[in-house]
Structures are given as structure tokens and as C-alpha cells.
């Protein structure tokens, strides 16, 4: 018996994806929507079987000592299954960006020049223990006219296999290429190494996972990536802030959820309002069990107000994405210092200012070099659904191609189209 060769297998997957991408680029909106709606119905129909298959993945993960948070991400509950199905219906209802022509201009020569939105081609998506990503990613790629290669975590291999079969069923029902969505069927990590170097077959890689995964892919990939490494998000309370508004925003930005990449990790406060802003906020944070790591000026302000249990912030804290109930706080001399801090220590993800001063707010928008910059809003709004994109495949803090939450348009590109009437260049 011939030994399994992961490189040969991945090359086959790549060739099949490239061939399927041509059919996907030609697919009409009704055809793509039919595949999504069939998949939604199939997921609801097979919910019990999906839970049984998923239970085996969960049992293995527990036996391997995975923690409760990991098990929670891996588990397909009734609610998670319904969320997947409903998400498919929402994506089907979104406008189809493919074929849209914009920016049409008449040139003095008589030609008309515009831009048409087209699929990227083949998208490789690498993710960890969430089976729902298999469906979400497949749906966005189908709707945007792309073929996709999905490589989920080995811990979810049976769940992903069951979902892959349903995706193939939906593609077949709509008359779309069967290999438009392929789920890598081997747990061999070498498959990831091959996927991220197949420039002849794969147009872009979208990684979704922890910092160690993203860092490894950044180092080894030859295929371009849409990604973000860190979510070191800031809120700056300006000298002209409405303090009640600032307290609400900063409470939500830190404590609504600790793990998402759009959670605030560093709070900056203008010196003139430090006592008024930090006293109520520190009370809220300590009541909720948030550890406060503070600069010397912040410590002096809070200790004068009777607070204890504070930790000294180190240089490393300003660079840290905690993803936990920990917050670093710095008192600054104003908006200049706040912008300087953010552009020095931030990760170009999401940053917000609380101010009633229009000029200061607009300056913050212009000068903070991040994918999302906000005035008087929680960083937790940095999300594709909240931005009206309907769904997102991830968030990018890069500057090329997609930036910020990546929805359907982020999985497309623009090509120039020219309409002539027999003109020739002289």
C-alpha cells in the first residue's frame, strides 16, 4: 500500500480548488444563495447527528486535558447549531458584491473606465477548535464567489468532516463545483506548512487563531495573508470628556467580555480629569475583579482616593494583549501624549477617544494609525456585524488590501473595465 504523502494530497486539493474557483467566479447570486439555504436546512435536519459526532471530538479533547474554555469553543450545542444555520440565512440575504461596477468615468478620448468587483480566487483559511468557523468561512467564500480550502484544528476533525459533507451537499444542490469548499481531511500539521506555500494554487491565507499560530504563519508563509497578530486596544479619556459617558464606555470596553481582540487593554486618562474619571472606574473594575496595573501618577491618584491592591505597570504591560481581567492604566498630559502612546505601543487594531471637543476628536481620527478609530464609543463595536457587514471572516490590522473587519467585500478585489466605441489610442 502506498504511504500517504501529505504534499501530494495538498497539491491535489490546491489543483481542485483552482479549477473550482473558475466555476465559482461564474456563479450567479441565486445559485450561491441556493447552496447557502440548502446548507442551513441540512444543518437543522442533521442537528442530532452533528452533536453525536461532535461529542466524540469533545471526549477526546477532555481526555487530552484541554481546559474548559477550549471545550466550550469546541462544543456544538443546540444554540450553536441554530446560530450556524441562521448565519447562513443572513449571508444569503446580503447583497452580492460580485460583478458590481463602480467609479465609472468618461475620459476625453471617449472611453469609459470603471472598476468591477471580482472574487480573489482561492482562499485558504486556517483556524483552531471552533467547528462553527467551518460553516461561517465556507458561507462567506461561497457568497463572494471564491473557492476555499479549510484547515481546522485536529481536535475538531470529526465535526469538521461531518460539516464538510453537508457543505458538499449544498454545493451539489445548487450545481456548484463540488471542490469549491474543501476541508483538509488530515490532522498532519505538515498540511498547514504546505498550504501556506502553495502560491500557484492559493491567492490568500486567512488565519484565525491564537498569537502563536499567527506568528508561525507570518514567519513561514509565502502566500499573502489577511490577519492581525494582537488586539492591544486603547480608550483615551480626554480633558473635554463627559465623565459619565467615559465611565460607561470604559466599563463596557473592558468588562463586557475579556477574550475578544477588540477588548480594551490600556486606558489612557488626561491628567486634568484623572481623579474624576478614575475614581468611579477603579471602583467598577475592582468590584468586577479586574487587576489594575498602573503608572506612578495613576497610583498616586487612586491611593489618594482610598484604593489599594494596585500593581505597578511595567514597560511590557503597554505592549501586552491580556485577554483577561487585567487592565493597564496611564495618566497622560493630553491628546498629544495619548496619540504618541497609542502609535508607539498599540497594535493598529482599534482605539477610541472620549471627548466633547470636535476638533480634538477629528485630530484623533486622523492621527491614530489603526484599522478602526472611534469617538465616544466602546472598542467592542469593532466587529463586522456591528459595522453592518453582516458577517466577518476576521479582522485585519494590515494596511494592504483589507483593513478592519473583513466581510464579503474584503474577500474580493477590483479590476478595471473599459467600455469603448471603437476608440484607438493616438
UniProtKB/Swiss-Prot annotation:
The lineage of its organism: Bacteria, Pseudomonadati, Pseudomonadota, Betaproteobacteria, Burkholderiales. It catalyses: L-glutamate 5-semialdehyde + phosphate + NADP(+) = L-glutamyl 5-phosphate + NADPH + H(+). One of its GO terms (cellular component) is cytoplasm. This is Gamma-glutamyl phosphate reductase. It holds the Pfam family Aldedh. GO terms for molecular function: glutamate-5-semialdehyde dehydrogenase activity; NADP binding. The gene is proA. Keywords: Amino-acid biosynthesis, Cytoplasm, NADP, Oxidoreductase, Proline biosynthesis. It comes from the Bacteria. It is found in: Cytoplasm. Belongs to the gamma-glutamyl phosphate reductase family. The keyword Cytoplasm applies.
Amino acid at each position: 500500500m502506498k504511504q500517504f504523502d501529505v504534499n501530494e494530497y495538498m497539491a491535489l486539493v490546491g489543483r481542485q480548488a483552482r479549477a473550482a474557483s473558475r466555476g465559482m467566479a461564474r456563479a450567479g447570486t441565486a445559485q450561491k444563495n441556493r447552496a447557502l439555504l440548502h446548507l442551513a436546512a441540512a444543518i437543522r435536519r442533521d442537528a442530532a447527528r452533528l452533536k453525536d459526532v461532535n461529542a466524540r471530538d469533545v471526549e477526546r479533547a477532555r481526555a487530552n486535558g484541554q481546559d474548559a474554555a477550549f471545550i466550550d469553543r469546541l462544543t456544538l450545542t443546540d444554540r450553536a447549531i441554530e446560530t450556524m444555520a441562521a448565519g447562513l440565512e443572513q449571508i444569503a440575504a446580503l447583497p452580492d458584491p460580485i460583478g458590481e461596477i463602480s467609479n465609472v468615468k468618461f475620459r476625453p478620448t471617449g472611453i469609459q473606465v470603471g472598476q468591477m468587483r471580482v472574487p480573489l480566487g482561492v482562499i485558504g483559511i486556517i483556524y483552531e477548535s471552533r467547528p462553527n468557523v467551518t460553516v461561517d468561512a465556507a458561507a462567506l467564500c461561497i457568497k463572494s464567489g471564491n473557492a476555499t480550502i479549510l484547515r481546522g484544528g485536529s481536535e475538531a476533525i470529526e465535526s469538521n468532516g461531518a460539516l464538510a459533507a453537508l457543505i458538499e451537499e449544498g454545493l451539489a444542490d445548487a450545481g456548484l463545483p463540488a471542490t469549491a469548499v474543501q476541508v483538509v481531511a488530515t490532522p498532519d500539521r505538515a498540511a498547514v506548512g504546505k498550504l501556506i506555500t502553495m502560491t500557484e494554487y492559493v491567492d490568500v491565507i486567512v488565519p484565525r487563531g491564537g498569537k502563536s499560530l499567527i506568528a508561525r504563519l507570518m514567519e513561514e508563509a509565502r502566500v499573502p495573508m489577511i490577519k492581525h497578530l494582537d488586539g492591544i486596544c486603547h480608550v483615551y479619556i480626554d480633558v473635554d470628556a463627559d465623565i459619565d459617558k467615559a465611565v460607561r464606555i470604559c466599563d463596557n470596553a473592558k468588562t463586557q467580555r475579556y477574550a475578544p481582540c477588540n477588548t480594551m487593554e490600556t486606558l489612557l486618562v488626561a491628567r486634568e480629569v484623572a481623579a474624576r474619571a478614575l475614581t468611579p472606574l477603579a471602583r467598577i473594575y475592582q468590584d468586577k475583579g479586574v487587576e489594575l496595573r498602573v503608572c506612578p501618577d495613576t497610583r498616586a491618584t487612586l491611593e489618594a482616593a482610598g484604593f489599594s491592591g494596585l500593581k505597578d505597570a511595567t514597560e511590557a504591560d503597554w505592549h501586552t494583549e491580556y485577554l483577561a481581567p487585567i487592565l493597564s492604566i496611564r495618566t497622560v498630559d493630553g491628546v498629544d501624549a495619548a496619540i504618541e502612546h497609542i502609535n508607539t505601543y498599540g497594535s493598529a487594531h482599534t482605539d477610541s477617544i472620549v471627548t466633547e471637543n470636535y476638533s480634538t476628536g477629528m485630530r484623533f481620527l486622523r492621527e491614530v494609525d489603526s484599522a478602526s478609530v472611534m469617538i465616544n464609543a466602546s472598542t467592542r463595536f469593532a466587529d463586522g456585524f456591528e459595522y453592518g457587514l453582516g458577517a466577518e471572516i476576521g479582522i485585519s490590522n494590515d494596511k494592504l488590501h483589507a483593513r478592519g473587519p473583513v466581510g464579503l467585500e474584503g474577500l474580493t478585489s477590483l479590476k478595471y473595465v473599459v467600455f469603448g466605441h471603437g476608440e484607438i489610442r493616438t
